[in-house]
C-alpha cells in the first residue's frame, strides 16, 4: 500500500485531508504518526515556497526511515488574504497576532478592523499551496483559492481557523456553516489534490 505523509501537526487539517484522499487507497499519515519530529521553519516569501520547504525537509527525514523510503510527502501552506487589508494576514495567517492567540480573538480582531467597510470591499480568499515531494527527490507545487468575502459576524461550528468569518455569498453562509462534506467539495485543498 502506498504511503503518504502529510507534513502537519494540525489535527483539523488531517481530518480534512483524510476525507479528501479517502478514495486513493493509500495509507495517510500525519508527520507525528510517521514518527517525524521536526519543526520546519517556514521562511519563504510565498505560500508556494513555504509548502515546498516543508515537503522537502520532511521528505529528507522520511527517506532515512526504511518504512517511509518510498513515501510521498505532501505539505501545504495556506492562509487567508483580505484585499482591503493588503492581503493580510496572508502567509502569516497561523502566526497572526501570535501563535498562541485563539482564532476567536483573531477573527474578532479582523472583524473589528473591517467595521464599516462595505461588502464589495471585503473581498477575500483562502489560498492553499500544496507541494508533493516524491521519492525520487522531485517536488511539485500547485496553488488553489476559494473566493469569498469577510462576513460581519462569527458564525458556524464546522471547520476551523478563519472559517467562521469567511462568507460565501453564493451559499449565503460562512465556510464554518457548511457541512463537512460540502466544505470538502468546495475546498481549495481538494481542488489541488485532484490536479
Segments predicted by a language model, with ranges:
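Anionic-ligand binding patches
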Residues: 2-5, 11-192
Amino acid at each position: 500500500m502506498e504511503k503518504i505523509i502529510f507534513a502537519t501537526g494540525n489535527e483539523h487539517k488531517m481530518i480534512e485531508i483524510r476525507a479528501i484522499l479517502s478514495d486513493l487507497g493509500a495509507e495517510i499519515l500525519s508527520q507525528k504518526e510517521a514518527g517525524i519530529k521536526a519543526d520546519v521553519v517556514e521562511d519563504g516569501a510565498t505560500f508556494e515556497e513555504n509548502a515546498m520547504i516543508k515537503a522537502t525537509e520532511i521528505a529528507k527525514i522520511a527517506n532515512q526511515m526504511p518504512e517511509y523510503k518510498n513515501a510521498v510527502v505532501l505539505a501545504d501552506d495556506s492562509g487567508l488574504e483580505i484585499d482591503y487589508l493588503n492581503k493580510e494576514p496572508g502567509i502569516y495567517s497561523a502566526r497572526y497576532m501570535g501563535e498562541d492567540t485563539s482564532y476567536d480573538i483573531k477573527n474578532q480582531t479582523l472583524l473589528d478592523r473591517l467595521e464599516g467597510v462595505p461588502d464589495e470591499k471585503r473581498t477575500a480568499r483562502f489560498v492553499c499551496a500544496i507541494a508533493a515531494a516524491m521519492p525520487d527527490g522531485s517536488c511539485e507545487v500547485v496553488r488553489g483559492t476559494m473566493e469569498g468575502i469577510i462576513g460581519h459576524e462569527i458564525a458556524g461550528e464546522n471547520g476551523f481557523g478563519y472559517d467562521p468569518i469567511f462568507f460565501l455569498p453564493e451559499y449565503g453562509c460562512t465556510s464554518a456553516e457548511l457541512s463537512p462534506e460540502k466544505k470538502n467539495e468546495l475546498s481549495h485543498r481538494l481542488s489541488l489534490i485532484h490536479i
